[in-house]
Amino acid sequence: MKFGKYLEARQLELAEYNSHFIDYKALKKLIKQLAIPTLKASSDLDLHLTLDDIDEKIIHQRLQENKAAFFFKLERELEKVNGYYLARESDLRIKFNILHSKYKDYKINGKLNSNQATSFKNLYAAFKKFQKDLRNLEQYVELNKTGFSKALKKWDKRSQSHDKDFYLATVVSIQPIFTRDGPLKLNDETLHILLELNDIDNNNRRADIQSSTFTNDDDDDNNTSNNNKHNNNNNNNNNNNNNNNNNNILHNNYELTTSKISENQLEHLFQASSSSLDMEMEIENWYKEILNIATVKDVQRKHALLRNFRETKIFTYLLQNSSESFHKNVFSLLKECLTTLFLLLVASPLDDNSLHIFYKSNQDHIDLSYCDEDDQVFSRKNVFHEAASCPEKSRLFILDEALTTSKLSKETVQKLLNAQDIHSRVPLHYAAELGKLEFVHSLLITNLLEDVDPIDSDSKTPLVLAITNNHIDVVRDLLTIGGANASPIEKPILDYSKNVISSTKVQFDPLNVACKFNNHDAAKLLLEIRSKQNADNAKNKSSQHLCQPLFKKNSTGLCTLHIVAKIGGDPQLIQLLIRYGADPNEIDGFNKWTPIFYAVRSGHSEVITELLKHNARLDIEDDNGHSPLFYALWESHVDVLNALLQRPLNLPSAPLNEINSQSSTQRLNTIDLTPNDDKFDLDIQDSIPDFALPPPIIPLRKYGHNFLEKKIFIKLKLRPGLESIKLTQDNGIIMSSSPGRITLSSNLPEIIPRNVILPVRSGEINNFCKDISETNDEEDDDEISEDHDDGEIIFQVDSIDDFSMDFEIFPSFGTRIIAKTTAMPFLFKKVAINSIATMNLPLFDTRLNNIGSLTLDYQIIFPYPGNPLKIINYEPYWKSTGSDLMTSSKDGNFVTSSSLNGSFISVLVCALNDETIVAAPKPYVEFKGTKILLNDLTKEQLEKVVDYDFGKIDGSFDEVTLKQYLSSRVVPLRSLLEVIPGSAQLVIRVYFPTDKEIDTIPIKISPFININQFIDKLLLIIFEHERFLRHSGSGSMRQIVFSSCNWEACSILNWKQPNFPVLLQMKNLLRDSTTGKFVGDTPNCLKELAVNPQKMSYLNTELINIHTMVQFAMNNNLLGVTLPYEVLKICPSLARIIKQNGLLLIASVGENDQIPADGGYSGIYYACELLFENNIDM
């Protein structure tokens, strides 16, 4: 992603840091301005001067002359971010000190003994929010660090200087923002407190479990029968009446009773110690009692209990436990208790009717404007925040009561309704987010809201939240009744220190949000309102009522159709947007793509079909020279490919930058240096290459590939994102510390510890297909580097008997460990059919509490156990060539030569159920119309099925007769090699089913067979045969090429030996001759053998994955890949890209097809024969 766009997008997520980031865009424009010679206004020629008219030397000279101006601006930006960082760090330190003091106070006073206590919940939520603030500060630091580095890099390239490294080392890196470790310490201390809270939580849970045995007996007694229930209720009522007989009048008429209390009684109450009053815990108990009362089925009794709760519970408690200040503050104390209790109940699942009865019976003693002192630290929510954010109940009556019967003034209610909580949200935010239509409607018609579009800390307005959650009725009310802005303009931010507008506050565009969440109704409503507003403004013709565009680009430069195409939106939404004027061929501001590119890469065939109906163009190429069809083959699936093939592809391709060329040409023909101009950039003319060493004198691929001689290959693979780490769902405290990296360390001293940055990068290779020669230097400069790893960690060890691996998980920000686990040696000894297995390891925190699990895949490849062919004695597939070939070609590829040439006869090999390795025309045999897989049969069973002695081979063969023989007979591979002429070259096609084929076909594999053992036996036969040829006097090796559709088989073959090359073959994409459409198959073309064909439906939506195939071949040092000619024919650029990455490309041609004349392929696979060209260049 381009850094400028990335930085702009991040400002939406870090709204509180908006306008305080490095002004990267302004620095780029300054470089551009400083590079332009001073223009004379009187010269018409100068006014229309283009970049092509400016000599490059003049640009460099101008930048050197204005060097002081650029670095002056850069230093001001450094002062800005540094000053804001110091202020922000100071604020966070103060906030932590307050929270820490609260934590210590609560802990001493026993307020954290229960995880259900309000103090516990508030403290946990506050520390969780504080952790988020720390993470945001760290991201702010990293983004600015990257910004300064890239701005200096751009300066060096434009001015041809070398100031970047020196300035970063001597000026930027020594600033407090990049050197202080205060936030790291705060994060560690915060995590320590959260772990202690977690211990309290776990201890309480254990106590609850231990006490449950006692409560279960009571519950059984209370639920024996209906008669017993009735008797028990009567007995309980009688007992209550007896116990409270002397106090009924007092409870029902507490004001009168209080006035009649004698002075002796008051003196007795004054003697009670104030320290014994723990009002908070008692309020918690009252809270639970009211929730239990709400479950009573007798409605009249429930209502009576709620109405009398104040007298029967609260007032009695105050009489028995009040302090000396009771006589003076009894009413204020009672009011505080009832108000606090009511606020708790507002946020509870208590039904509205019960809560309303409780409120009406205590209305005179509940202050709706009350706000606890602790809440100013924790949440800053008032009663309207709590009512609006209650997810299960309406709570509308609270707003009605505040507006009608309460004693609150209108000004107070207005202040409460517009008050912001700790997340900068007003009650309208929560009501809109939860879809509380009546609550939103009541808020809007009060006319007390100062702003209907307030922006919270996540840059979201109530309208955006309603659209996100698909509350269309709320959206309609906000737009029509509240007058929410359907087309908001970024709000200016005033710099009070300078009394100027420093920047604008970035916010989400509602229509783009509706498109992102596939909200057709909201998009329709927004477009209708925007169109009407533009029509009214057009009639007005006033400068104050300018028409706003219907469609706006989001922070990453995507337009509405691009967003819909990327997420796979509803075709009706596409129709709606196009009906209102959206262009299906519009180019976005990020990748310079049209919407169909995004639909292809995201795999949305229905979107592609809809776009094609509206004349979306396919005869276009992006800046890298790739068409939508290329990306469909490169990283999409079969349905997408077939959707694109509905349109004829014989039209000449046009670059995307030629679309709407007239308007773009006009923009580029004049020099426009206004602050808002983003189209004109000197980067287009930049051709200065990155500093790079020349290619080595002897290319690495000249000497074949690495192989395992005695070491064991172990590869650990973490899953994309954070899928490998599963934290316990009910352990919210630990989950609040997001994993940021995993450290792997082994017990073996020779293995260096590794760090994996999280989240793990997905398998997509976004820029892998970019031409080396066409890579724009400016694009590299603008791209934000991804620090995340691909999750693969490789080790080579002598033995797995004593190999273990420790995994330590750390937060993304901080040094305190979150969790740890260990993989013991026995886990790596599990025999895997395809060499790949999965392990699940329990995760433990520092107190050895299990908090989740770590899931990862691992692959183990053992070295060849026998005597390999020594390279010094047996010529490998590569050979030394003259120095004239050891150069870099003009397209950036290393040119090497291979000894492979001529014709190679194809031999398919597989293992029987008894481990016998045979050569066969297909991986199955037909018996009375039934296809039986060879791996299901033993040698004896196979002979009975084929009805001949397959171990006996009569006569000798030449190339022609050998092909005919292999097309109809199943023979042991060892016997076959003995009778084949030594001059015959072979391509050994290794058949071994993949894990998915084993599961979906399904295929039964003998427990005595796995891919490691199978390849060991295969290599043993090949090596013995080669030695036999050498000792028989032939003096040379038989030329052999290994090929397989099983990716793991190719990898293992390449790691076990260096003598023979390995090709990875694709056979899972076929073209139906009747329909002309492509169909998916399994890697070994076994779909027709599936027991349940419905299980194979995934093949049409499974990724074609040519890009992953190419990347796998490169990572495992394979010689090349084999692709169907039908695929290469429809997209010739695939061949160029694959060959530019140093791989041989073999075109696989069907038996009924003609051999292509000259498609630039390294070889042709045709009719069970592999034909290599002479002098193959790689």
From Swiss-Prot:
Region described as Disordered: 210-250
Localization per record: Cytoplasm; Nucleus
Main location: cytoplasm
ANK repeats: 423-452, 458-487, 506-535, 556-586, 591-620, 624-653
Sites of Phosphoserine modification: S956
GO cellular component assignments: cytoplasm; cytosol; nucleus
Residue ranges crossing the lipid bilayer per the database entry: none
Residue ranges constituting the SPX domain according to the UniProt record: 1-169
Molecular function terms from GO: cyclin-dependent protein serine/threonine kinase inhibitor activity; phosphoric diester hydrolase activity
Ligase found in the keyword field: no
SS bond list: none
Swiss-Prot/TrEMBL keywords: ANK repeat, Cytoplasm, Nucleus, Phosphoprotein, Repeat
Top-level taxonomic group: Eukaryota
Tagged with keyword Phosphoprotein: yes
All residue ranges annotated as the GP-PDE domain in the record: 871-1178
PTM annotation, UniProt: Phosphorylated by the cyclin-CDK PHO80-PHO85. Phosphorylation mediates the formation of a stable interaction with the cyclin-CDK and is required for function as an active inhibitor of the complex under phosphate starvation conditions.
Compositional bias of kind Low complexity: 223-250
GO biological process: cellular response to phosphate starvation; lipid metabolic process; phosphate-containing compound metabolic process
Additional notes on this entry: Present with 2930 molecules/cell in log phase SD medium.
Described purpose of this protein according to its UniProt entry: Inhibits the kinase activity of the cyclin-CDKs PHO80-PHO85 and PCL7-PHO85 under low-phosphate conditions.
Subunit structure: Associates specifically with the PHO80-PHO85 and PCL7-PHO85 cyclin-CDK complexes, and much of this interaction is mediated through the PHO80 and PCL7 cyclin subunits. Interacts with the transcription factor PHO4.
Protein name: Phosphate system positive regulatory protein PHO81
Source species of the chain: Saccharomyces cerevisiae (strain ATCC 204508 / S288c)
Gene: PHO81
